[in-house]
Every structure is written in structure tokens, then in C-alpha cells.
């Protein structure tokens, strides 16, 4: 293949880079393969709908294979099948709270009923009365309502008491309990540090009472992210130091407020607390102590990292300045993640609907309990695996399209000497080039990520299934393999992004672009460490700033609630949303910095500033590199070594 051929490598070393000049289609076989794969995904969707799965999914069916709300045909050798359920439109489970999370099934008999019980039914007499008044029989079809109170008849064929109040799920005709206590054990499994139901209820009530504050803080994080993007565009030279100071103040402020609240709570007289509230007060004090210690540890670690990186922080200023100019000329880049997210949501909605259709597709089969399940037999049973691979590959393909679009727009900006000659819409021009020439390259790059991601997910599933059963050696090996595959996936993702940039520059196929990008990154190893990594770290500080600011605002707004234990869920929700919003905005800035760095490295490798070989880069960036090289030479021997790495690699003539 071209990825590893020595002849190809020799041609690459002699090949001239001609940015944006020659454009040709790349990796056409991979585009054809991807199109065929998508046709297969469409076949799975059509098959699942055409085989009647849509009616079983939407209307629901009972444990005997009868679809609710219609007349059914008799199934061979299956009792209670072939019933007329025209007036029984809802699925009712005799024990709706008995869920099997491992096998993703409801371990309960399902019946078609005329109405869901809107009030709790505590006795069999209540169940009988409900059937007589509403005409909705909640026991098995073989038992008459008059026989509900007979223990010998109703045992195992009537709902588990008490029957929780339920309501039909919109559009899906299933009776679902309206009381969340039915699912309390699953919430407790997620919140493992809580063993007292009263604490769990206080946490949930804290979220409900603070929903307006949570919504306001989420909007605040969105506004702060947009403000930070504006600051990055217009004051990039001082942005690094502003971020550093604000992060220090934000982390110190949040930590100080938590310790102040802890001291205030500890000094409060316990005699004034009624005995019933004493345990709650102790929980509050313990929660505040945990919050304060966690914030202190985070602040100390953050300070140590900033102390180590302080000498190299200045290296990012010039690169941030150029990136700010990119957003001035290409402001719509900020909204690129929203279009990508919208495309992902549409695909995921399609994928989930098809998955639900597949779950009710196939022939009726009687299981060990005598109930009906729908299973696909023969080669079609492997459609599940095909569908899962499609989820990963197409999702990675959509993300790769975003990377190629951003790379194409930034490359156009960088290699256009006169910025007044930029296309009217560089982003749309980049999308046009992607669709016309480079969809095959994107398909190949996303497939490589899929090849690494699938084994890692399989190992993670095996590890979760064997939890508590495997020995220490096997557990260590599994975790090591998962960790190695995760690292490989991250490295390949970074290489893929740079390969897309190389393709956007010179219109080469994926293998050639990946090889060229890898060689350039290796030749500029210290540049990658000193500029690219530090830039990413400063963007991370921007995310931390938004999270800390939003969290601090949340602490001040939630301070009126003296039950500090209930802070945990609202603060976690707000901080997670703030981080996701900040990541959504700043990830594009990070991507622009990465693309600019590769363009800069290629520019310095193939141009020397002489007539006919002028640099494309911004003068500010080149002046910064030269000044840094001189400063490092004056610093001594070690600095001279770094300077040799930082100076432009002039091409020998």
C-alpha cells in the first residue's frame, strides 16, 4: 500500500507541495465501500419496518404474541394467542418494577388492557373493583374478575400488590408507573455513596426546587463561553495571562467560600438543632468538608501544573493571535459544532428507532416460561452487529467531516497571501471540496478509528460482565488492554486530524497525507510540545474558568438552602453542562490551533523567505519564533538546543 511503500516515500520527499492548486478525488474505493455500507444500513431499517415490527413497537404486544389494539391471528402451539384486542390498547405489566438491567428485559407477564390504573390498588378487591368499573382486567385472560379474590386462582396471574398508579407513555401505549420510587433501586445504584433513602429523596427534591437556578446557570455558562470566544478573537495577546489570573482567582475563591461555609456550619450551636434534624446537620457538615477538601486538592494540582508550564506559556501568544485573526475572517466557524451535533442527533435518532424496530422483528418463538419472544434466525440475526458497527463508523464519519471542513477553511485562510482574496464563504467552499473530492478520505480515516474503538468496547463489555468473577491477573490484563487501545485511539485521532489537514492542503489520499503529517510532526517534536500542547492546556484553562465561574455562581445562589447535602446534584448538573458548552466552543479553537501549527510547519519546511519562496505565515508568528530562538541562545547551552528545534527548517538547494 501507499502507506508503507519505500517508493512512495521517495516520491513524497521529492514532491512539491502546492497548496490549494491541484485538486483531485481521493480514496474513491473507500467512498464506494462506505456507500455500500450505508445501503446495508438502509436495508436493515426497511427490513425491520416491513416485517411488522413497527406495529409491535408502537402498539405493544403481550406475553402471548398478541398486538394490542387490533385483532390478532392464532399462533401455532401458543396458548392465549389470536385474541381480539381491539378495545385493549395498552400494555400492562404485572410487575413493572421488576427490571432485568443485564438482559435489558422486563421480567414480568405483559397483558393488553383497556385502561391503565390511575390510582394505586392496594388489594385484590381494589383490582376487582377497577375491572368492574373501568372494564379493564388486570389479571390473566383465563381469570374472570369475579375470581380475582380467590387466592388459588390469582396466585401468579394477577399483578403484584400494591399495583402502582400508572399512565400510558405517549405514542407507545405502555402503562408506566408515575411514582419514581418504583425505580429507586436504580437511582441508588447510580448514587453509590448514598445508603439512606431519606438522603436520596432530599437530593431529588433539591434538584426539583432548584430547577430555575439550574436553568439560569446553564444559560450563564453559554453566555460566558460566547464572551470568552469574543475575548479570544480580539485580545489574544493578553488572553493567556488573563486566563491564568482568573483561573487562580476562581479556584481560590471557590475553595475559600467552601471552607468559610464549613467553618460557619461547624461553629453553629448544636443545641439549637432539634433532634430530628441532628443527622441532617451532620451530613451537611460532612458534605461541606468533602467539597472543601476536593476543591483544595484540585487547586493545588492546578497551581503545580501552571508553575511547571509558566516558562512556556508565552510560546502560545503568537499562535493565539493568528487563531484570533482566523475567527475574525471566519466567524461562522464558531457554530460548526452545532451543525455537527445536529447531524449526530438526527443519525442517533434514526439509529435508535431502527434498533427498537429490530428488537421486535422476527418470528414468534416460545421461551422457557411459555411466553412469546420475537427472534431473528439464520444469517439475518447478525444484523445487530452490523447495526452497532454502523453506529460507530457513521458517527466517526460525521465528526471527521467536521474536522475536514474546519481544516479546509483554515488552510484556505493560511495559504491565501492577500486575505482580501478569500472566498466569500470559505466554510461553504471547504464543504464543497469535501463533498466533491475527499469523502473517501474521511470514510477511510473514520473506519480506522472504528477498527480500534470496537475491540476496546468489546473488552469493556467483557470486563463489566466478569466484574467480581475474574482473578486479579485477568483483571489487570483486561484493564491494560483497554488502556492501550484508548491511547492508540487518541493517537490515531490526532494523526487523522493532521492527515485531513494535509489532504486539504495538497489533495493527497489518506495514507500519503497521514505519512506526510507524521513525518512533519516528528521533525517538529519540540514545537508540538512547546506550542501545540501548551495552547491546548490554555484552552483547557478556559474551560476550567467557565466551569469554576458557573460553579461559584451556583454556590452563591444555592447558599439560601441550608441543606448543603442537596447541592451535589444541582452543582454536578450545572458544572457538567458548563464544561460541555465550553468544550463545544473551545474545541473548534483547539482544532484551528492544530491546523495552523501544521500549516506553519509545512510553510517553514518548504519555504525560506527568498524571492519565489516567500512564507505564507503571519508576520507576528514568524517574528515570535525568531525572537524566541534568539532568547534561547542567550539563555545558554540548553536553550540553544531548543533554539535549533525552533528555527525554521530551510530547504537545501
From Swiss-Prot:
Keywords: Antiport, Cell membrane, Lipoprotein, Membrane, Mitochondrion, Mitochondrion outer membrane, Myristate, Phosphoprotein, Transmembrane, Transmembrane helix, Transport. A lipid is attached at residue 2 (N-myristoyl glycine). It comes from the Eukaryota. Pfam families: Choline_transpo. It catalyses: choline(out) + n H(+)(in) = choline(in) + n H(+)(out); ethanolamine(out) + n H(+)(in) = ethanolamine(in) + n H(+)(out). The keyword Transcription does not apply. GO terms for molecular function: antiporter activity; choline transmembrane transporter activity; ethanolamine transmembrane transporter activity. Its main location: membrane. Residues 2-29, 233-237, 309-314, 359-379, 558-565 are cytoplasmic. Belongs to the CTL (choline transporter-like) family. Choline/H+ antiporter. Also acts as a high-affinity ethanolamine/H+ antiporter, regulating the supply of extracellular ethanolamine (Etn) for the CDP-Etn pathway, redistribute intracellular Etn and balance the CDP-Cho and CDP-Etn arms of the Kennedy pathway. Involved in membrane synthesis and myelin production. This is Choline transporter-like protein 1. It comes from Mus musculus.
